[in-house]
């Protein structure tokens, strides 16, 4: 795990220490193990830990519909475990991020995750362009959204799409 991801995992862990009822702290820890841009494989222990953290987040009663959707995206990834490829896990997550960003069109973070997982599952430059357009749409709404900028770069990072 990179230093930045380790730091993120540590900070989310500090958040759940400070507030054990902060469901997003558990979800955040689970998400630090998922790396769709470089698609490293997880082992059985990592899948189990991610699912455990996700289930902990889901067990906290006072969560919003938005949070429940975020937890659902992590759950579909982790629940498949080693019986699915990483790509299949990302496809499952992408489906949930599609649902979430459609049902909550003002949620720029859901749109950013949608763009991220579309990049991860892209089979063609057309698919990457769709992901890039999602990221550009975020920037139309919120010009300083870091995910929007980050995923525009990754989506269009091919010789044919570079000028977009």
Walk through the language-model features, giving the residues of each.
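Amphipathic alpha-helices of TPR/Sel1-like and other helical repeat/solenoid scaffolds
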Residues: 5-15, 49-60, 89-104, 127-142, ...
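Short coil/turn and helix-start
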Residues: 2, 39-45, 82-88, 123-126
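Post-signal peptide N-terminal segment of secreted/secretory-pathway proteins
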Residues: 7-67
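Alpha-helical segment of the N-proximal tetratricopeptide repeat
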Residues: 1-11, 71, 75-86
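Amphipathic alpha-helical repeat scaffolds of TPR domains
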Residues: 21-37, 62-82, 105-123, 142-159
């Amino acid at each position: 795990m990179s230093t930045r991801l380790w730091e993120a995992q540590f900070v989310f862990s500090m958040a759940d220490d400070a507030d054990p009822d902060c469901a997003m702290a558990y979800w955040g820890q689970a998400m630090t193990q998922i790396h769709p841009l470089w698609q490293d494989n997880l082992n059985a222990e990592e899948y189990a830990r991610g699912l455990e953290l996700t289930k902990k987040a889901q067990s906290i009663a006072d969560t919003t519909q938005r949070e429940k959707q975020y937890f659902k995206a992590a759950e579909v990834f982790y629940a498949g475990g080693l019986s699915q490829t990483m790509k299949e896990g990302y496809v499952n997550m992408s489906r949930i991020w599609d649902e979430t960003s459609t049902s909550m069109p003002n949620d720029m973070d859901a749109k950013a995750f949608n763009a991220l997982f579309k990049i991860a599952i892209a089979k063609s430059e057309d698919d990457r362009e769709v992901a890039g357009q999602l990221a550009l749409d975020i920037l139309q709404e919120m010009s300083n959204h870091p995910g929007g900028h980050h995923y525009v770069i990754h989506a269009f990072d091919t010789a044919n799409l570079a000028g977009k």
